């Protein structure tokens, strides 16, 4: 059912009119519902051991909201569960650079802790 609901989402409400103030609240509400749906999908897939599908959903969510660190943390967990801590480390490094360059942000303490727990002292080069 998650997949069915997700397939109906076609992007932000009236995305061709991003500055239309009259629909901004509804656009934000529908966007949040979509992100909550993606969070539920990722969680269910991960619980079922479908880590590739969970990874796909997390990437979709991060494309829609790159600052939503809960999706990054879930993505890192799923990549490690797929046996690809090297991909997780590379994705984390890229995400940190992008977040800093575009928004001037650093990852939260919680995200750094998850990364360190999952990846430890492993670098992108030594996988």
Regions found by a protein language model. Name each.
Residues 1-127:
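Intrinsically disordered, charged and Pro/Gly-enriched terminal/linker segments
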């Amino acid at each position: 059912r998650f997949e069915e609901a997700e397939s109906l989402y076609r992007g932000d409400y009236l995305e061709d009119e991003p500055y239309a103030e009259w629909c901004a609240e509804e656009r934000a509400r529908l966007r949040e519902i979509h992100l909550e749906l993606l969070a539920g999908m990722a969680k269910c897939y991960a619980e079922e051991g479908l880590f590739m599908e969970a990874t796909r959903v997390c990437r979709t969510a991060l494309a829609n909201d790159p600052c939503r660190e809960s999706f990054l943390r879930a993505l890192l967990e799923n990549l490690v569960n797929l046996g690809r801590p090297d991909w997780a480390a590379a994705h984390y490094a890229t995400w940190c650079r992008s977040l800093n360059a575009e928004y001037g942000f650093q990852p939260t303490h919680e995200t750094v802790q998850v990364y360190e727990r999952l990846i430890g002292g492993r670098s992108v080069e030594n996988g």
